[in-house]
Amino acid sequence: MKIDFLTLFPEMFEGVLHSSILKKAQEKEAVSFNVVNFREYSDHKHKTVDDYPYGGGAGMVLKAQPVFDAVEDLTNKASKKPRIILVCPQGERYTQKKAEELAKEEHLMFICGHYEGYDERIREHLVTDEISIGDFVLTGGELPAMMIADSVVRLLPHVLGKEASHIEDSFSTGLLEHPHYTRPADYKGLKVPDVLLSGNHAKIEEWRRKESLKRTYTRRPDLIDSCKTLTEEEKRWLWQLHND
């Protein structure tokens, strides 16, 4: 997979793209990153990329020209047309399901904006997806783009050490993940549940599933309604939990 980031602040990506899973993914040649300062595409003599909004109002708006030229240049150099993603508060709420969808692509391109917003022609004529990571405001699109890229890259084949790791993550099954414990079994009187020390794998899996259901029900009940993996027994157990 290839991932392009169009940004005015390329230095923001240096640490993230060269650390942890993203670094390992590049070493395994599962992904390559290309960080592009789209200011370089500005046709203004001072390389200006923003201007005042027509009709007045506060803030500055990113101009269409440098973004269009950057996207067109990178797309023309690509072997396949990329999925072009605009990260913005107005976009579709990002989910694990969306991450799995994007992980099937060969080429992603993120447009990371700043200022008040984008010239609407960018949104209407360039992008294939608009994505939001939540109902809050950030200074720019760089952090959301990096978050999305991280969640996508870890789904690529052979990136994680244990291939099943991402399947067991929260949201991959439609539920929050169960609690985890490690050594020592007793820390200052705080003990690991006995079932995890029993060696009975069937009982352990049953405990993990119930804890996952319980945690999801108490913290994110909205996910229970959309979960399609519940058995009839689990539905009865949740009903009992609800009535307790």
UniProtKB/Swiss-Prot annotation:
Keywords: Cytoplasm, Methyltransferase, S-adenosyl-L-methionine, Transferase, tRNA processing. It is an enzyme of class 2 (transferase). GO terms for molecular function: tRNA (guanine(37)-N1)-methyltransferase activity. GO terms for cellular component: cytosol. Coiled coil: none annotated. Its main location: cytoplasm. It catalyses: guanosine(37) in tRNA + S-adenosyl-L-methionine = N(1)-methylguanosine(37) in tRNA + S-adenosyl-L-homocysteine + H(+). Its EC number is 2.1.1.228. One of its GO terms (biological process) is tRNA N1-guanine methylation. It holds the Pfam family tRNA_m1G_MT. It is found in: Cytoplasm. S-adenosyl-L-methionine binds at residues 113, 133-138. InterPro entries: Alpha/beta_knot_MTases, tRNA_m1G_MeTrfase_C_sf, tRNA_m1G_MeTrfase_TrmD, tRNA_m1G_MTases_N, tRNA_MeTrfase_TRMD/TRM10. Disulfide bonds: none annotated. HAMAP family: TrmD (MF_00605). Specifically methylates guanosine-37 in various tRNAs. Belongs to the RNA methyltransferase TrmD family. Homodimer. PANTHER family: TRNA (GUANINE-N(1)-)-METHYLTRANSFERASE. This is tRNA (guanine-N(1)-)-methyltransferase. The gene is trmD.
